[in-house]
Amino acid sequence: MHVKKGDKVQVITGKDKGKQGVILVAFPKQNRVIVEGVNIVKKHSKPSQLNPQGGIITKEAPIHVSNVMVLDPKTGEPTRVGFKVEDGKKVRIAKKSGELLDK
């Protein structure tokens, strides 16, 4: 998967197209990510011990990883991700600027 938790991304398709946010959780097996402030859904919850009130809760739902692009650290524009071996380690680079994405 070309994105990781903590990456700044932009949504490129769907109802939230153009929105930017940080990846909160990544699910590599399902190829899905949860992006902060994107794909907000309303969830109805029964009263429980954790939430005695119950009611409607708004939270982020996962979106497919193909619908997001990493933002270039240099320019702030969406960019594709490339891989390169440096000092025996595989690192991610931004295709537009060649900047390293992994610190």
UniProtKB/Swiss-Prot annotation:
It comes from the Bacteria. Keywords: Ribonucleoprotein, Ribosomal protein, RNA-binding, rRNA-binding. One of two assembly initiator proteins, it binds directly to the 5'-end of the 23S rRNA, where it nucleates assembly of the 50S subunit. One of the proteins that surrounds the polypeptide exit tunnel on the outside of the subunit. One of its GO terms (biological process) is translation. GO terms for cellular component: ribonucleoprotein complex; ribosome. GO terms for molecular function: rRNA binding; structural constituent of ribosome. Part of the 50S ribosomal subunit. Belongs to the universal ribosomal protein uL24 family. Pfam families: KOW, ribosomal_L24. The keyword Kinase does not apply. The keyword Nucleotide-binding does not apply. This is Large ribosomal subunit protein uL24.
